[in-house]
Swiss-Prot record:
Compartment(s) where it occurs, according to its Swiss-Prot or TrEMBL record: Cytoplasm
EC number, UniProt record: 5.2.1.8
Source organism per UniProt: Campylobacter fetus subsp. fetus (strain 82-40)
Enzyme category, top tier: isomerase
GO biological process, one term: protein transport
Segments traversing the membrane: none
Cellular component, GO annotation: cytoplasm
UniProt protein name: Trigger factor
Length: 435
């Protein structure tokens, strides 16, 4: 088997060979001989099974194993020809051609390697920003929110239901005139405007009077968890029994202890300072996500140019396409299923964004290495568990779900990115005058 290989650029190489039928058959025969020594077939002693019997029973499996072995041989021989090591490879080689004719196989592969990333001078592209300011009014509003949060619910006498009120009501949902499982409850308590129910439901209850009944028309989101309801129109029959609300209490000693349970003798000044820092942190996070990160990303991909592994770019294109799939109409989905050329053309629209995303990922990875930024397994576990608690789901099941979907590396990368950007943008702060 003669292998030809050449570097396409610093991150990709092409390999080509033709495997003769005799070479493939020899591989299969050799594997069958090895298997015959250990395999057990009724009527034959262990180690005495004829090769012909092994081939008869396991021939197809052995042929697949032989092809896999040839595939590995091609990769290894290619690495020698282009002076690369197996540790340089990133991802799986892409099979561009695998044509079988008269027992011979014409194979073309593309092998990708970890890119050579240099980020010298990254300090020059860190955007400047001013420390977010926090006003007295913002602190007072936040304290008022906390006071309302811990206040008990009370029945409210008012004309009709408004945003922010708590509604005690009965409901039953129908799709195509039929009630569906899980779509009924009595005496249910819901904060109007909280977004707990499907879009349109809470808005449809606005203006409802105590004792009044109403049909609320909604449409389940296309990505709704229950597949049999996803995208369906529904009617919910609701009856309002009571309107409840919360009144902000006083900021007394007892309330301060509730709001700051870890402080021995909490004071209003301590609470204000803590809230001020939290508001500032929230504002900075917003600034980071909406302004600083995008600016840095645009400048980074423009400044740091390097060859990208094609297989990783292709994976990113596929991922972006899959993410967008749910946004297509039924007609569009049907068209893509039936028209391969239209599917290919649509997939190509994600290429530029995918290239930018992959490029930025490698830049972030290199910067994180230079700055010694890591995320431990314990930190990753805590983050996944915390997310589970926020959504009220079992943390162990949530972790297992992430493992099955292969999402843990992506979560870890996102955490490294967050640490990195918080570290980077410290040096971009040109003004720190507080209020």
């Amino acid at each position: 088997m003669e292998v030809k290989a050449k570097l396409l650029n610093t991150a990709n190489a092409a390999a080509q060979t033709e495997v003769k039928a005799s070479e493939l058959n020899a591989k299969v025969e050799n594997l069958a001989k090895k298997a015959a020594k250990n395999i057990k077939i009724d009527g034959f002693r262990k180690g005495k099974v004829p090769v012909a019997q092994v081939l008869k029973r396991y021939g197809k499996d052995l042929e697949n194993d032989a092809k896999s072995e040839i595939f590995r041989d091609i990769v290894n021989e290619s690495l020698k020809l282009i002076a690369k090591k197996s540790s340089d490879i990133i991802g799986e080689p892409m099979i561009l051609k695998f044509d079988e004719k008269d027992g011979n196989i014409d194979i073309e592969l593309e092998i990708s390697f970890k890119p050579e990333v240099k980020v010298d001078g990254y300090e020059e592209i860190i955007p400047e920003y001013t420390t977010p300011k926090v006003t007295k009014k913002e602190i007072e509003e936040k304290i008022n929110e906390f006071l309302k949060m811990i206040a008990p619910l009370e029945k409210v006498e008012k004309e009709s239901l408004e945003k922010g009120d708590f509604a005690k009501f009965d409901f039953e949902g129908f799709v195509d005139g039929e009630a569906f499982e899980g779509g009924k409850a009595e005496g249910y308590l819901l904060e109007i405007g909280s977004g707990q129910f499907i879009p349109g439901f809470e808005d449809g209850m606005l203006g409802l009077k105590v004792g009044e009944q109403k049909d609320v028309n909604v449409t389940f989101p296309a990505e709704y968890g229950a597949a049999h309801l996803a995208g369906k129109s529904a009617v919910f029959k609701v009856k309002l029994h009571e309107i409840q609300g919360k009144k902000a209490g006083k900021l007394d000693e007892e309330t301060l202890k509730k709001l700051m349970p870890n402080e021995e003798n909490p004071t209003a000044e301590q609470l204000e300072d803590r809230i001020k820092e939290q508001i500032r942190a929230d504002k900075f996070q917003k600034l980071l996500n909406e302004d600083l990160k995008p600016k840095f990303a645009d400048k980074a991909v423009e400044k740091f140019k390097f060859d990208l592994p094609n297989n990783i770019v292709e994976q990113e294109i596929d991922m972006q396409f899959r993410s967008a799939w749910g946004n297509f109409s039924e007609d569009e989905m049907k068209k893509f299923r039936e028209d391969k050329e239209a599917l290919k053309k649509q997939r190509e629209t994600y290429k530029n964004e995918a290239i930018k995303s992959v490029q930025l990922t490698f830049i972030i990875d290199e910067l994180a290495k230079q700055k010694g930024i890591t995320v431990s397994d314990n930190e990753l576990l805590q983050a996944v568990y915390f997310e589970a608690y926020r959504y009220g789901i079992d943390p162990k099941e949530h972790l297992e779900s992430y493992k099955k979907q292969g999402m843990l590396p992506a979560v870890k990368m996102a955490m490294i990115e967050e640490k990195l950007f918080n570290n980077l943008f410290k040096s971009g702060n040109r003004e720190d005058k507080g209020e």
